[in-house]
Amino acid sequence: MNQTLNSSGTVESALNYSRGSTVHTAYLVLSSLAMFTCLCGMAGNSMVIWLLGFRMHRNPFCIYILNLAAADLLFLFSMASTLSLETQPLVNTTDKVHELMKRLMYFAYTVGLSLLTAISTQRCLSVLFPIWFKCHRPRHLSAWVCGLLWTLCLLMNGLTSSFCSKFLKFNEDRCFRVDMVQAALIMGVLTPVMTLSSLTLFVWVRRSSQQWRRQPTRLFVVVLASVLVFLICSLPLSIYWFVLYWLSLPPEMQVLCFSLSRLSSSVSSSANPVIYFLVGSRRSHRLPTRSLGTVLQQALREEPELEGGETPTVGTNEMGA
């Protein structure tokens, strides 16, 4: 990741060399689409933060969604700022701000991935061990986990910045080691745990819903949809960060991979609010004038639904949604 950041001049050189070519045109088109996606995503995540932070009663799961929306908003803001700075003259001040925005983007990315891993793992535990989870789960576990993840990601990215920044004491050997630790953490721990827990959750809830003739809860759909979108759209950015340094790709190919990974990651961070409101508005023909807050609250509801769409008066979390 940091090796890629510090070698970003290769991409800039390729862009300067290929001005007027098909590659440069593709870069401009993809960057414009990414900027538009970032602006839409910032609006959507800001709406989620406003509703969850000031307009709704929050259950423990909503704490995760609130923090995930904040991480996505920070990622999209830094991505949009980076895209804007690329059009400015490369003076010394702009270079420093450009690197700051990239560091901020990597920080927000790791926070978002960590939160998604925590969300999918917690939901998996809640369906595999419902009684134990309900009785032994600390009251403020969600807030503690979110605070811990933000702190750990801040420390990790602060450490990498101290070793890998072009404007601080750059140490290539230490930067390489820190880069490998980050790669192992993201690609070898967080992503596999998130994928495995989500797959387990899907299989368990699918079997339970068929056995008890209940529809999966909307919360279950939200979790799986968010993880799936991340794996499809945002994971390529990690692959770009960690694979590009090892491969001697032509400059034109680097530009295309660079642009496509940014566009796909911006789509991933912008998609979650859309998922919440689409899932929350299912079967909304009975209440066609529901507010956005009500729709969001329905999407994050933990109670299971019966086949006809009713919510049981006394529900458990045993079937997993």
Swiss-Prot record:
Membrane-side (Extracellular) residue stretches: 1-33, 81-112, 164-184, 240-257
Topological type in the membrane? Multi-pass membrane protein
Q: Which GO terms describe its biological process?
A: adenylate cyclase-activating G protein-coupled receptor signaling pathway; angiotensin-mediated vasodilation involved in regulation of systemic arterial blood pressure; G protein-coupled receptor signaling pathway
- Localization in the cell: Cell membrane
An example Gene Ontology molecular-function term? G protein-coupled peptide receptor activity
Which parts of this chain are annotated as the region Disordered?
Answer: 302-321
A Gene Ontology cellular-component term: extracellular space
| SUPFAM superfamilies with a match to the protein in the record | Family A G protein-coupled receptor-like
Q: Which residues cross the membrane?
A: 34-54, 60-80, 113-133, 143-163, 185-205, 219-239, 258-280
Q: Which residues form the signal peptide?
A: none
List, alphabetically, the Pfam families matched: 7tm_1 (PF00001)
Identify its protein family. Belongs to the G-protein coupled receptor 1 family. Mas subfamily.
Q: What does this protein do?
A: May regulate nociceptor function and/or development, including the sensation or modulation of pain. Functions as a specific membrane receptor for beta-alanine. Beta-alanine at micromolar doses specifically evoked Ca(2+) influx in cells expressing the receptor. Beta-alanine decreases forskolin-stimulated cAMP production in cells expressing the receptor, suggesting that the receptor couples with G-protein G(q) and G(i).
Identify this protein by name: Mas-related G-protein coupled receptor member D
Taxonomic source organism: Homo sapiens
Quote the gene name from the UniProt entry: MRGPRD
